[in-house]
Amino acid sequence: MSRSRSSAKAVQFKHESEEEEEDEEEQLPSRRMHSYGDAAAIGSGVPAFLAKLWRLVDDADTNRLICWTKDGQSFVIQNQAQFAKELLPLNYKHNNMASFIRQLNMYGFHKITSIDNGGLRFDRDEIEFSHPFFKRNSPFLLDQIKRKISNNKNGDDKGVLKPEAMSKILTDVKVMRGRQDNLDSRFSAMKQENEVLWREIASLRQKHAKQQQIVNKLIQFLITIVQPSRNMSGVKRHVQLMINNTPEIDRARTTSETESESGGGPVIHELREELLDEVMNPSPAGYTAASHYDQESVSPPAVERPRSNMSISSHNVDYSNQSVEDLLLQGNGTAGGNILVGGAASPMAQSVSQSPAQHDVYTVTEAPDSHVQEVPNSPPYYEEQNVLTTPMVREQEQQKRQQLKENNKLRRQAGDVILDAGDILVDSSSPKAQRTSIQHSTQPDVMVQPMIIKSEPENSSGLMDLMTPANDLYSVNFISEDMPTDIFEDALLPDGVEEAAKLDQQQKFGQSTVSSGKFASNFDVPTNSTLLDANQASTSKAAAKAQASEEEGMAVAKYSGAENGNNRDTNNSQLLRMASVDELHGHLESMQDELETLKDLLRGDGVAIDQNMLMGLFNDSDLMDNYGLSFPNDSISSEKKAPSGSELISYQPMYDLSDILDTDDGNNDQEASRRQMQTQSSVLNTPRHEL
């Protein structure tokens, strides 16, 4: 189909070209062609195609194939096939009907379609054409019919441009290029400026972040200096934590173990639960218990943190320094080897005596594992870490401490009056017992958990005979009356809190006494049948009066390093002595002066304070390490492993700047004077000693 169409088009183009050539050739003959009267009517400029068409339509002989319509405005070709076969070869040298119709369209003829003329009749082979200037009896109008110009010629005419237009276009292009170059340069400059601005913004942001960090650090530092309690950095905690295998607890825990393993000291065994029924109902001569507890006078429960190895003791058993002869009845003895003693919290401590030549007697009070239930009427207790530190709260705490000091002073005065009235002779006293006076009258009886004390005779050896009264550490005379009891205590703690905690423990857990031949080798049991009051023998002033006749030139003893003597092992500590107690007092005064100078320096302006540096100066491990004291059982206790989960240690936080920058100079003077008074009027506990 495509090939047939292409061939048909080629034939059509060939006929058209031939027709055009014929038209050009026949223009001149057609001008001279005149038939009868129509020759004068057709003009000289009429194309041959139009002249031939006019002759065919107007000829009556060809009406059967082509003729005018009734109105004479158009002509009709009735039989196209026969017309193409018979008439076209005679006039146009071809028999292609399509080429003839195309020529008519080129000269402006239009096909007329109507309802009557084949619009709805497909069986009729007729076709009608019309032109405004092709009419019957009007041949003179043929000159106005013009052939349409071909597309190729129009394209050639339009493709030719004038030089003026071309030059104008070139100038416009040059202007546009200049503008584009200008815009490109501006865009590049803007990009560079934008990059510079972004870099400056990044640098400024970094500087701003650094400045903000510096300001925040300065604000936090100032807040910690001015108000350290707000961020809980300066709060002292007195609550004990469960920590395993700490050096301080190992020392305190293994003290009794080393003494018992040495073979020369008493062995204390705690009863199990299945043996309590046998112990709760002993014979009257072997067991006596009395305990009084005043619920209304109970101070709030507080936990006393240990200060040194000398002050760390078991919280379940309280060992006092009070001598046995103050509490034993004269002439009252037992025949058994094991003595069961019930402790009492009242001042009238009851005990059972035995001949010191056969066995050692101890008065022991075992405290319960947990505190007694809090009395509903007792005042609430607030720890320092839960109390907001404000000037009003500080003032109230200062008032409470002053009131507590006055009460203690009144108790000491009352004890002195009783001692002066009764002429009681006291050999040794404990400062803990002075806080439990005048309370036994209203205290109800409380049964304390008993303990079995197994008394074993000491193994005498030749080394004991070499000791003289001057160098015997076991003798009572070794204790100096000028030695302070708080030499191993932490002086940085508030005195009011310390005294309240000790008083509370004395009221709850009672007074107990432990003495042995180690501490008093020879003593006489009093012959009086009455018991001595523990409070009367516990005041510091009474102890000072009773020991006024002792030697005043005693030196202060300290343990350090190792000793190469013959009487002790190489692992034991060396006994060093200071020249006099006055040197200790002078050292304390110099340290106090240095602290005052440091306070004045810190109060001055322009002093850069590093909080971490100041806190590092007050490391607990340095301050609380027994003040330079070491003991022979340290190496032994370090090798032993404590059972997991059975130790208690106090949590000691870093010291606060508020303790150093305290502006209350009057309170500091009072505390310094009180410490000096206690130093002069107190008696040091018997130092530990091991074989």
Curated annotation (Swiss-Prot):
SUPFAM superfamilies: Winged helix' DNA-binding domain. Residues 675-685 have a biased composition (Polar residues). The modification Phosphothreonine is found at residue 258. Residues 46-150 bind DNA. It is found in: Nucleus. It holds the Pfam family Vert_HS_TF. GO terms for cellular component: chromatin; nucleus; polytene chromosome. This is Heat shock factor protein. It comes from Drosophila melanogaster.
